[in-house]
């Protein structure tokens, strides 16, 4: 539930993958991908009990970034997105093999015709690590400005798309990682300019780093 623990576990999991250290996961049982019940991905990732959750569009007004309060609201909203992005990356790692098998067995020639390659898992583990870095950058800026992640209400809108696509790998890849991420790329430069106009160079540096990483998420 703790985003800071999520970041730490993400770093550990990526290190384990790079070093070839097994830390759980499924296995083939004839033509079925089996995952122990304790390792099934949750229907909804847990959140801290004191999190203030509101409907999409009902969170604190962000303004145009001219005031520190407005910039805090913008950074907080972005940190919420990055926290969900960590969850989404790991969710597609966990669900991918079973969904790939389902596609193969469907007989649809446009679907994947072989087990997912190691590069699939490596790419999404790297994505999870990037999102963890992004959350950390944003959380640090919030702390620098006298706030913290969790100080403002957040919404769970991104996870709604995950629920809608959890039974279709191609839909998940298209909606989450092409549509939503691409929308972020469109908005990011405008957000960066708001912080630049306010003279917030440290946030500009953090947001620019995030933007450049997100470009690779869409292009690969």
Describe the role of every protein-language-model region.
Residues 1-220:
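Non-heme di-metal
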């Amino acid at each position: 539930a703790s985003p800071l623990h999520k970041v730490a576990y993400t770093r550990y999991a990526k290190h384990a993958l790079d070093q070839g250290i097994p830390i759980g996961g499924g296995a083939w049982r004839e033509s079925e991908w089996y995952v122990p019940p304790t390792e099934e991905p949750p229907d909804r990732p847990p959140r801290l009990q004191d999190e203030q959750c509101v409907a999409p569009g009902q969170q604190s007004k962000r303004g145009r970034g001219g005031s520190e309060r407005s910039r805090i609201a913008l950074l907080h909203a972005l940190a919420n997105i990055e926290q969900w992005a960590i969850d989404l990356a790991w969710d597609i790692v966990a669900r991918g093999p079973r969904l790939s098998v389902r596609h193969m067995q469907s007989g649809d020639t446009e679907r994947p015709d072989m087990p997912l390659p190691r590069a699939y898992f490596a790419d999404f583990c790297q994505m999870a690590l990037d999102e963890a870095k992004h959350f950390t950058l944003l959380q640090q800026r919030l702390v620098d400005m006298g706030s913290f992640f969790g100080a403002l209400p957040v919404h769970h809108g991104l996870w709604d798309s995950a629920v809608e696509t959890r039974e279709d790998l191609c839909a998940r890849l298209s909606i989450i990682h092409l549509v939503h991420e691409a929308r972020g790329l469109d908005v990011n430069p405008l957000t960066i300019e708001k912080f630049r106009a306010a003279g917030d160079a440290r946030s500009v540096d953090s947001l620019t780093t995030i933007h450049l990483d997100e470009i690779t998420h869409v292009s690969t």
